[in-house]
């Protein structure tokens, strides 16, 4: 069984939590795409739900699958958000944003009663940081912002290369919100909650990919089956 099969299994398990009439946040990334496709099959079979996409890519996927969409300007709360993650630790703290949609993903997740994270077993780690941490930044004053990010990382005992993400054209990758992303290659983040606080306080940082205290449930698919972990 390959990794895509495992992702689809996790997505299918999360779909079991969806009920008629729900308002659902639709995540971004390869695993979340499986959920959108499976949800679309249920919608075509008569399930009545409405979704809020976390990126323009997900919006296009959902529309293609026939899922009715809205925005957080039209509704105030969501019943559920289903999204993937780049890393998950035992406290259900996450690194997200490898696909560049971290800002909208966090806004949508925070507006939800529950967040279910779906992933294959390789995303489960003892300590966050092996996957580069995305930090979404304003282009203005980039050098000053980069220095402040370095200082924040150092304060929690993390260090490594900070790299401006590039798009396929070789220029700076631009998010749906018009911002840039600095990827922090830290290897290990000893205190993710503290780093999240420090990054959020930096002028020039729009958002970061540390999701702390947001995920309610993690569904992990592996070669031995599916494991569900609830936040304590």
UniProtKB/Swiss-Prot annotation:
Keyword Chaperone among UniProt keywords: no
| EC number assigned by the record | 5.3.1.6
GO biological process: one example? pentose-phosphate shunt, non-oxidative branch
Instruction: List the keywords (alphabetical).
Output: Isomerase
What does the record give as the active site?
105
Q: In which pathway does it act?
A: Carbohydrate degradation; pentose phosphate pathway; D-ribose 5-phosphate from D-ribulose 5-phosphate (non-oxidative stage): step 1/1
Which enzyme type, at the first EC level? isomerase
Q: Which GO terms describe its molecular function?
A: ribose-5-phosphate isomerase activity
Keyword Isomerase present in the record's keywords: the answer is yes
InterPro entries per the record? NagB/RpiA_transferase-like, Ribose-5P_isomerase, Ribose5P_isomerase_typA_subgr, Ribose5P_isomerase_type_A
Name a Pfam family for this protein. Answer: Rib_5-P_isom_A
Q: Which domain of life is it from?
A: Bacteria
Catalytic reaction annotation? aldehydo-D-ribose 5-phosphate = D-ribulose 5-phosphate
Annotated substrate binding sites: 28-31, 83-86, 96-99, 123
**PANTHER family given for it?**
RIBOSE-5-PHOSPHATE ISOMERASE 3, CHLOROPLASTIC-RELATED (PTHR43748:SF3)
Q: According to its UniProt record, which protein family does this protein belong to? A: Belongs to the ribose 5-phosphate isomerase family.
Its subunit composition reads: Homodimer.
| Function field | Catalyzes the reversible conversion of ribose-5-phosphate to ribulose 5-phosphate.
Q: What is this protein called?
A: Ribose-5-phosphate isomerase A
What organism is the protein native to? Rhodopseudomonas palustris (strain HaA2)
């Amino acid at each position: 069984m390959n990794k895509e099969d495992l992702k689809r299994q996790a997505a299918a398990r999360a779909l079991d939590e969806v009920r008629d009439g729900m308002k659902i946040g639709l995540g971004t990334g390869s695993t979340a795409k499986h959920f959108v496709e499976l949800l679309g099959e249920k919608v075509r079979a008569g399930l009545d739900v409405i979704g809020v996409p976390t990126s323009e890519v997900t919006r296009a996927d959902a529309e293609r699958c026939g899922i009715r969409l809205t925005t957080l300007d039209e509704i105030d709360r969501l019943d559920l958000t289903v999204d993937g993650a780049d890393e998950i630790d035992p406290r259900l703290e996450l690194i997200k944003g490898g696909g560049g949609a971290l800002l909208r993903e966090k806004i949508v997740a925070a507006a939800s009663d529950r967040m279910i994270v779906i992933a294959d077993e390789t995303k489960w780690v003892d300590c966050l940081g092996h996957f580069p941490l995305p930090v979404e930044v304003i282009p203005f004053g980039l050098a000053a912002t980069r220095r402040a990010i370095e200082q924040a990382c150092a304060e929690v005992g993390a260090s490594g290369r900070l790299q401006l993400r590039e798009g396929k054209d070789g220029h700076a990758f631009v998010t749906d919100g018009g911002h840039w992303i600095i990827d922090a290659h830290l290897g290990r983040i000893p205190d993710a909650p503290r780093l999240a606080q420090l990054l959020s306080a930096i002028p020039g940082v729009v958002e970061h990919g540390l999701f702390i205290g947001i995920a309610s449930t993690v569904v992990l698919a592996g070669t031995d089956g599916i494991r569900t972990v609830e936040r304590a």
